[in-house]
C-alpha cells in the first residue's frame, strides 16, 4: 500500500519528463549509468564472487553482460520511485499504517514497479518470497488501480515487475563499491546480491532485456 501511495499520484504525469535531473531513462543517462555500474563490476566480483553459489554467479554474469540493454529498455518514465525501498529505509510506528520512508538519495523517475520488485526480492527470504510473491504483487497492482491508475493491466504490471528484478542487482553492485567497506556492509551486500539474482533466476527474467522500449510500452494513465 505504501509503495502504491508513492507511485500512483504521479503515474504517467507528463510533467515528469521535464525533470531531467531525475530521469535515468534517457539514452544519455542510461548509457552513463550503465557504464558506471559496469566499471565497478570487476571489483565487486573480486570481493563477493568467491562467496556466491555457482548458479548465482552465472546469473550475475549474464545480467551484467546485458546491463546496457536493461537501462535502454527501462519502461517509460512512468512515475517517481524511491529507488532503494528496503526495511532499513522504513520507520515503523505503532499502527499498521504508520510507516515513513526515509533516505531519498536514490529517487528517480522511471518504472515504479521496480520499487516493488526491489522490496520483495531483497527483504524476504527466497522461500518466503516464492510462497507469497504473487499475492503481494497483485495486492500492489490493485492498490495502484484503487488510487486511480488506469490501463495498467495485471499482465503489464507483472512484466514490469520482472524487469524490475534487475534493479536490485545493479544497485547492489554499485552501492557495494561506492560506500565505505565494512564487515556489516559486506554481509548485507552478499546477502542482497544472492537474493536479487535468485529473484531474477526464479522469474527467468532474461527475456526482459529484449522486451521493453518506449515505443512498445502502453502508458498507464490515471483515471
Feature roles, as predicted:
Residues 106, 112-149, 165-187:
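Active-site activation/catalytic loop segments of kinase-like enzymes and analogous catalytic loops
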Residues 167-223:
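ATP/Mg2+ or Mg2+-diphosphate-binding catalytic cores
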Residues 86-122:
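Catalytic activation segment of kinase domains across protein kinase-like and atypical kinase folds
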Residues 1, 39, 80, 85, ...:
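Generic recognition of stable, solvent-exposed alpha-helical segments in well-folded globular domains
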Residues 149-165:
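All-alpha amphipathic helical-bundle segments outside canonical DNA-binding/catalytic cores
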Residues 1-82, 94, 200, 210-211, ...:
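ATP-dependent phospho-/nucleotidyl transfer catalytic cores
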